Amino acid sequence: MNTTAQSIYDEAPLGAHIRFIDGTPRPPERFKRKLSAWKERNSAGQLTQRSPAGTGSSPCPATFTLHEGNFGSGGIVILSVSRIFVVTDQRRFEVTSVPPPGAALVVQAWDDHRELLHVAQDRAAAEVWLQQHGYHRAHVEIVGEAETLIKAA
């Protein structure tokens, strides 16, 4: 089911995999540049952060961040690709999956922001990941059954 950027911001849980599309048809493979541009506008990622709207002298709309992937080799990340969307974005979004009940989210929090760092199968795996990566402000949150049912609908 396609939805709006505002709905993703309001309803999708951290860790959800989200696909975004602009509604244009995919060009044939032989048109390399057109296909590359289309892939930039039509992709997917994991919801890692929400930022509230800014107020004051230079207001800005609320945003959310989708993590598209990491690039590197030998277990070393060289480049991490994320994309920020404003809630007024005109593309269509679709939640393709959410973390299952019992999954553990490693979350870093500061002020009124929460950023997802990792999704693990359970608390023990999340604690191991946290020990290996050493984020000092991070904590583990367990995904509940009710939250998953509400967000996946």
What do these predicted regions represent?
Residues 25, 31-82:
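Basic/aromatic-rich interaction segments and small domains that mediate binding to polyanionic partners
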Residues 79-99:
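Short, structured interface segments
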Residues 97-113:
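Short aromatic-glycine-(Arg/Gly/Cys) micro-motifs in beta-strand/loop hairpins
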